[in-house]
Structure formats: C-alpha cells, structure tokens
Regions:
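Amphipathic protein-protein interaction modules
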Residues: 45-103
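Short proline/glycine- and acidic-rich turn/helix-capping motifs at secondary-structure junctions
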Residues: 49, 103-118
Length: 118
C-alpha cells in the first residue's frame, strides 16, 4: 500500500503514513463523523496510535519518536534490527486498519473518550 512507507537513512528508520491519500483521508472523515474530536490530522493520528498501540502493541511504542504534521503522520526509530522489526509491524498494523476500516470505526465508537485527542 503506497500510503505507508518505511525509509532507512543513516541511523534512522522513518515510517510515514500519508493521511491525505484518498483512502486514509476518506476513512479519517468517517472517523470524524463518528466522533467530533477525531478530526484526523497527523496530530490526532498520533493520539489514536498512542492509545491503540499502548493498549494492543505496547512493544511498538518502545523507542518511537512521533513527528506528526497537519497532513501526515511520521514516526522515527533509531536504527537497530529490533526497531526495524517494530517499524515493519507498525506498517502492517496501519495497513490492516486502513484495509479493514471497520476496526478503526469500532475503536472510535467504543473507546474515543479514552483517547487524548489534539
């Protein structure tokens, strides 16, 4: 899926989720319809993933640095073999959630009040 990419340069692993591509953007709009606080800019994707990963995949948050922007969600890891695995797992999680968007909507419907939105 071309809306999420991993790049490696120097001692850094960078994962970028392009939230302005059609499919993620449309899903973000639906998430916002479900919960007014969930206007899905990069900062609220950070809030969502902080919550979702913390609850379901806390190991992925170890060593992660978030760098969201209005139109994208980016994370960095220091380059290690372990962090490369984490980045690949995070990419797979993002793809799974976007390709199976009902999972996202379920979290928003049932747990939005637990998320620290921007």
């Amino acid at each position: 899926m071309d809306y999420v990419k991993i790049m490696k340069y120097g001692n850094i692993i960078n994962l970028t989720f392009n939230i302005e591509q059609d499919k993620p953007f449309d899903i973000g709009e639906k998430m916002n319809e479900i919960c007014a606080d969930a206007y899905m800019n990069g900062y609220n994707w950070e809030a969502f993933f902080n919550y979702y990963l913390g609850k379901n995949y806390p190991e992925i948050l170890e060593g992660i640095d978030f760098d969201p922007k209005a139109g994208m969600f980016t994370v960095y890891y220091d380059y290690t073999p372990e962090n490369e695995i984490k980045a690949e797992k995070l990419k797979a999680i993002i793809i799974d959630l976007i390709e199976n968007e009902e999972k996202l909507y379920k979290v928003i419907k049932e747990e939005a009040a637990n998320i620290e939105w921007d």
